[in-house]
Amino acid sequence: MALTNNLWAFVFGILGNIISFVVFLAPVPTFVRICKKKSTEGFQSLPYVSALFSAMLWIYYAMQKDGTAFLLITINAFGCVIETIYIVLFVSYANKKTRISTLKVLGLLNFLGFAAIVLVCELLTKGSTREKVLGGICVGFSVSVFAAPLSIMRVVVRTRSVEFMPFSLSLFLTISAVTWLFYGLAIKDFYVALPNVLGAFLGAVQMILYIIFKYYKTPVAQKTDKSKDVSDHSIDIAKLTTVIPGAVLDSAVHQPPALHNVPETKIQLTEVKSQNMTDPKDQINKDVQKQSQV
């Protein structure tokens, strides 16, 4: 087997499988919460649908490599299984509107889209040409997914808060990207290495931002508006794939309740109390008058 003749490729491939395995399990707490509450709340399904599509693409690409990318198949096969479980759970607990939209995206992207790619590659390309076409598609999809963390980093810079960007996940995603980068270099595969250059860079930027803003005290005015800036999709999206993009976090998917109405409520309560309160001297005079009347 060609892979065993390259010690570094084998080492980085095994490390990449282990780290990616951990990253694939990152959404487990989210789905435990969904199962307990029997509701998907504000979470979205796009990250998991995208992750499944990415894993399917990389398996198909690795199958064209004559066994030299076997470790890509193992981790992405696990990814297909775990992402399918996530999607089934999500659809089971989603409301009707969300369920229908999820199934539409799943059908268009993972069934029709993937089937179209397979048909085009099988009918119109052969050998190294097919490998190049598939590699280009995989790189293009992975790079497009890398745009998701940019929205999260923008929120961090604007709000001066790292609430939506946990350091641990950013660290694991960065390590995973670096590992698969070296794996791609070891097997001399440009299509595996290239997306992870961007992944490693964005992961490093996320950790730097976290260190900068970790102890920054967020002004109240900014803190009340930051939930408006966070939108999902993040996606994450396909954050849990072999070619790991930047973190698109579940906390970003689930938007917290808006806080901008709280000060107004307090003001209203204060006004009500002030209207109901009477001056102590006036109250004493009224009591004296009542006693004199008696």
Swiss-Prot record:
Q: Which GO terms describe its biological process?
A: anther dehiscence; callose deposition in cell wall; gibberellic acid transmembrane transport; pollen development; seed growth; sucrose transport
Q: Membrane topology for this entry?
A: Multi-pass membrane protein
Spell out which residues lie on the membrane's Extracellular side: 1-7, 64-69, 126-132, 188-192
Which keywords, in A-to-Z order, does the entry hold? Cell membrane, Membrane, Repeat, Sugar transport, Transmembrane, Transmembrane helix, Transport
Which intervals hold domain MtN3/slv? 10-97, 133-216
**Its Gene Ontology molecular function terms?**
gibberellin transmembrane transporter activity; sucrose transmembrane transporter activity; sugar transmembrane transporter activity
Location of this chain's protein in the cell: Cell membrane
Covalent S-S links between cysteines: none
Q: Which Gene3D superfamilies match?
A: 1.20.1280.290
Q: In which tissues is it expressed?
A: Expressed at low levels in leaves.
For bias kind Basic and acidic residues, which ranges apply? 279-294
Q: InterPro entries this protein is in? A: SWEET (IPR047664), SWEET_rpt (IPR004316)
Using the UniProt annotation, give all residue ranges assigned to the region (Disordered).
Answer: 273-294
Q: What Gene Ontology cellular component terms go with this record?
A: plasma membrane
Q: Per the entry, what induces it? A: Slightly induced by the fungal pathogen B.cinerea.
Q: Where are the transmembrane segments?
A: 8-28, 43-63, 70-90, 105-125, 133-153, 167-187, 193-213
Q: Which residues lie on this side of the membrane: Cytoplasmic?
A: 29-42, 91-104, 154-166, 214-294
In its keyword annotation, does this UniProt entry include rRNA-binding? Answer: no
Any Pfam family matching the protein: MtN3_slv
Protein's job: Mediates both low-affinity uptake and efflux of sugar across the plasma membrane. Involved in nurturing the male gametophyte.
> What family is this protein classified in?
Belongs to the SWEET sugar transporter family.
Can you state the subunit structure given in the record?
Forms heterooligomers with SWEET1, SWEET3, SWEET6, SWEET7, SWEET8, SWEET9, SWEET11 and SWEET17.
The record's listing under PANTHER family reads: BIDIRECTIONAL SUGAR TRANSPORTER SWEET13, RAG1-ACTIVATING PROTEIN 1
The identity of this protein, by name, is Bidirectional sugar transporter SWEET13
Q: Which organism is it from?
A: Arabidopsis thaliana
